[in-house]
Amino acid sequence: MFQIDDAYNSNPVGAKVALEVLGMMPGDKVVVTPGMVELGAEEEKYNKEFGEEISAVADYVILVGEKQTKPIYDGLMAKKYDKDRIIITNDVRQTYILVNKLKGKKDIYALYENDLPDTYNE
């Protein structure tokens, strides 16, 4: 498994660039994210757009926190992304285990996009 760590201080522009990098990788692509926070009134809009952008790149998506990732999920669904390729967990520590369970014949490239601030509560 190969990891792309974009977990610090994610924003809409940086997340889009990280997805472009992930898209260049030859194997199965996984996006692991709790979504972007602290974006003010536009937070839901940006996260939905992020979900739409993820749908064009990722073979699998692991969402951390059902409530805060709903806009991302909605963006994925707007693009008719396969629900069977979406995993939702409330425990960020489980994401590494979940990514490793996805191993198949191809290499796995996992983009870790954003990390929630310590003070964030769903």
Please identify what each model-predicted range represents.
Residues 1-122:
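ATP-dependent carboxylate-amine ligase
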